[in-house]
Amino acid sequence: MAKKSKQLCAALEKIDSTKAYSVEEAVALAKETNFAKFDATVEVAYNLNIDVKKADQQIRGAMVLPNGTGKTSRVLVFARGAKAEEAKAAGADFVGEDDLVAKINDGWLDFDVVIATPDMMALVGRLGRVLGPRNLMPNPKTGTVTMDVAKAVEESKGGKITYRADRAGNVQAIIGKVSFEAEKLVENFKAFNETIQKAKPATAKGTYVTNLTITTTQGVGIKVDVNSL
């Protein structure tokens, strides 16, 4: 514990808490101050000036990062017949119907993404209490309820991330791993930021992005200058 505190203090000394950094500076600092003994995840956290209580100000979606996430997602697909075969051919880790529902209800959760064809949603709906709180419920807005299961599987395996604003207007997302070259992380950030900017509700007033930080697993939050975006 003392060693971890020492590492944290060393990281804090390199970061000026009163300063808002450019994206490039923040990424460089995130890599430099990371003290995890594993390949830590690099994340961004936005605070948006939106009112998610209003239907037209809810932000949710998915995108594929240009350089991936550095993580291999375990993909589960609910499909039958030809669509099930398409999912398997595309690289899905688990494909099934009632058998998977029973397994999940018994407590099995060894997967990261759930995809379903529209005709399977009545079945998948039985898992709402299990999948919903874990943000695993398939949804058309994130491209996980679709007839094009092959594309959905390939995207999920190739760096697709999902995002959603919480009740306070916070949006968090992975943009890669500490082991990524800084340029790759910056490219991923810029792609995600462009998506967030395009998602700005027409009815949102005032400054859209009120706060933005970049951090690593167990790392220190580094404030990004929102005016530099």
UniProtKB/Swiss-Prot annotation:
It holds the Pfam family Ribosomal_L1. Keywords: Repressor, Ribonucleoprotein, Ribosomal protein, RNA-binding, rRNA-binding, Translation regulation, tRNA-binding. It comes from the Bacteria. One of its GO terms (cellular component) is large ribosomal subunit. GO terms for biological process: regulation of translation; translation. One of its GO terms (molecular function) is rRNA binding. InterPro entries: Ribosom_uL1_bac-type, Ribosomal_uL1, Ribosomal_uL1-like, Ribosomal_uL1/biogenesis, Ribosomal_uL1_3-a/b-sand, Ribosomal_uL1_CS. PANTHER family: 54S RIBOSOMAL PROTEIN L1, MITOCHONDRIAL, LARGE RIBOSOMAL SUBUNIT PROTEIN UL1M. Binds directly to 23S rRNA. The L1 stalk is quite mobile in the ribosome, and is involved in E site tRNA release. Part of the 50S ribosomal subunit. Belongs to the universal ribosomal protein uL1 family. This is Large ribosomal subunit protein uL1. The gene is rplA.
